[in-house]
């Protein structure tokens, strides 16, 4: 299962969807495409807004500052991930710990 832990200044994505075999997993592809598209968009607007830390099976998005335009991209990413989680509840879980 992919877990997306949402905090005020950090989003952590861990795990595997396990919907299908490696290379054929549409849930993993959807989550990856959503997150990477958002990261690229945010970096184009202001490359100091976020830092990315990637390890095996884990991606941390650290939010260094809040800017309206990039906050909207982050909100859109989370909305898309919520939609994926709603469609595939056995494969994606959103854990909201925003304060």
What are these regions (language model features)?
Residues 1-26, 35-36, 40-99:
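N-terminal intrinsically disordered, cationic/polar leader segments
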Residues 31-33:
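Gly/Ser/Thr-rich active-site loops/lids in small-molecule metabolic enzymes
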